[in-house]
Amino acid sequence: MNYRRYYIPNSTVFIVGVTRNRIPRFSHQENVELFKEMFDATSDKYRFELSASVILPDHFHLLLKPVGCNFSEIMLSFKKRFTDNFKKRNGISANFSFWQGRFWDHVIRNEGDFKSHLDYIHYNPVKHGCVSKPEDWHNSSYLAWVERGAYSIGWGHTRIEELEKLSFE
C-alpha cells in the first residue's frame, strides 16, 4: 500500500510517532534525554521551528514547521539517529526497531486547527492518566506556553470532554 504525504511549503505539521509494539520506552528518563539530544542534533542538519511537543511513555506529538525541507526528511533523520544511538548505548548489535514503521502527520490548516492540536498535545499526559494536571508533566512544552500567555495554570485540571474523544495516535 502506498502512503501519500502532503507537503505544503511553510506549513506547520502535527506529527505523531509511536514506539514499536507501544513498549513504554520513554518511561526511562535516559531515553527521554536521548530523544531531546537527537532531536536537537537533527535541527543541526534540517531547519525547522518546533512550536510544541510532548513525550509520553510510548509515543510523542510534535507541532513543527519545516524550513527549506520537508517533515519526512526531518523524521527519517531523527528516527534513524535516535535508533542508532539507542542501540549503541544499550549494546544492541542485532537488527532492532525502536519505532513503528511510519509516523502519522496532519498539515495544520488554520489558527483554529493549530490551537486544537496544541491543546491536544498539552492535555495528552492527563488524557493518558500520566498526571492529573498538565503542568506536572515535564516532558512537554506546556509550561512554555503558559509563560507565553496561551494557558493559565488550572487549564486541564478538569476533564476536557472534546479532547478526551480525540485520538491522533
Predicted regions and their residues:
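Short catalytic/metal-binding and nucleic-acid-binding patches
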Residues: 1-169
